[in-house]
């Protein structure tokens, strides 16, 4: 419909987006993107994802037997999030994770640690942005059997400033390294956004997040990615 006054120009562009920031974001120049690693199993495969929603992971955990002798990488998991909007990463990522060990017989020992890596992946090439290694934990099953021993980690990862472009992936990798004595010990890392107390791992072994009947540990892993804000 034409305007009554020909000196007026019809407004044809959308109104500008109004961005709001918290005091912490304004003073630090960064915000955090909270992501949860999870696995989804169907009839043909298991898919690993980084999600922002509280979903159930199936399996709840991933486990593997430690190697005898020297430290060997026994678990190597990549969790990906497809990026649909360019953003810049700068600062320290914050990670909470739980990993542990279990044996089905008494008097078994093992040592283990986990390395967490944050990467950019374009579908063919990985670019490492930062990594951190947990302390090395020692497990001893004592006189009992089927005994879990869980360890909770709170970690910082210093990240190289980097832009993640539309169509690329933000990738978080978990490497579990372990060694055992002369008998088998299973090392487990959990990744359930819904934080369930019981479930199964990728070998259909029952997972119980209660340690010795006194403490119930979280089964979710959280990665807080620092995003640079241009204000």
Residue spans of the language-model regions?
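Proprotein-processing/basic-patch segments
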Residues: 1-92, 96-108, 162, 169-231
């Amino acid at each position: 419909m034409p305007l009554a006054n020909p000196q007026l120009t019809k407004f044809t562009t959308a109104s500008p987006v109004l961005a709001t920031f918290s005091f912490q974001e304004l003073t630090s120049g960064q915000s955090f993107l909270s992501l949860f690693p999870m696995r989804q199993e169907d009839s043909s495969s298991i898919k690993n994802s980084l999600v922002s929603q509280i979903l159930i992971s199936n399996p709840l955990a991933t486990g593997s037997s430690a190697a005898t002798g020297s430290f060997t990488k026994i678990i190597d998991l990549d969790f990906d999030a497809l990026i649909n909007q360019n953003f810049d990463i700068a600062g320290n990522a914050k990670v909470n994770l739980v990993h542990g060990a279990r044996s089905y017989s008494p008097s078994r020992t093992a040592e283990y640690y986990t390395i967490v890596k944050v990467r950019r992946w374009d579908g063919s090439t990985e670019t490492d942005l930062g990594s951190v290694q947990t302390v090395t934990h020692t497990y001893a099953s004592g006189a009992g059997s089927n005994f879990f021993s869980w360890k909770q980690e709170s970690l910082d990862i210093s990240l190289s400033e980097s832009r993640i472009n539309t169509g690329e992936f933000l990738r978080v990798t978990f490497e579990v390294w372990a060694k055992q004595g002369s008998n088998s010990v299973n090392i487990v890392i959990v990744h359930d956004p819904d934080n369930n107390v019981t479930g199964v791992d990728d070998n259909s072994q029952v997972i119980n997040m209660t340690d010795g009947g006194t403490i119930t540990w979280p089964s979710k892993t959280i990665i807080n990615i620092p995003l640079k804000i241009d204000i």
